[in-house]
């Protein structure tokens, strides 16, 4: 869902059907998921949980490298990660901007020293948007530092009106609004592209609870 919303083209209308059509185009353009592009993990102690088999191979963490075979996104990697018992609960979308082939700044200015510019969406209940970029350090000379600008709905007059994630989904389900849901066609497309992974999943790697 997150991948589709980030990669989809503008819909013809701000309506569930039009948005779902564009999301399904993204799903259909996905390359098959190769087992070599997937990491599966299981936190230590999971098999001791009530109702869990001591031989369980179920993952509690997964990281996937995806690519889209279309004109706009060909060659651009997408990385999806989700897991339980992480060091912190986060819902983040981070877009890294590709560095230009040449820079007008001097080699010793510090440009690129802290990685590429990022546009980051924090989808937690108090949603935030931040942009990291390089800016000139005050004073003579040309030295650049990594700076950041941020907007947070928690700092607006409407902070109390923000719905929690499941509140929004339940409300949309009651209203019959499937904008945030995957259609049957979308699920089928994703299932087809997951067949190589389902046929030969990589082994789970143990990791410590409350860790990265």
Predicted segments with their positions:
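Secretory/organelle targeting and membrane-embedding segments
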Residues: 1-212
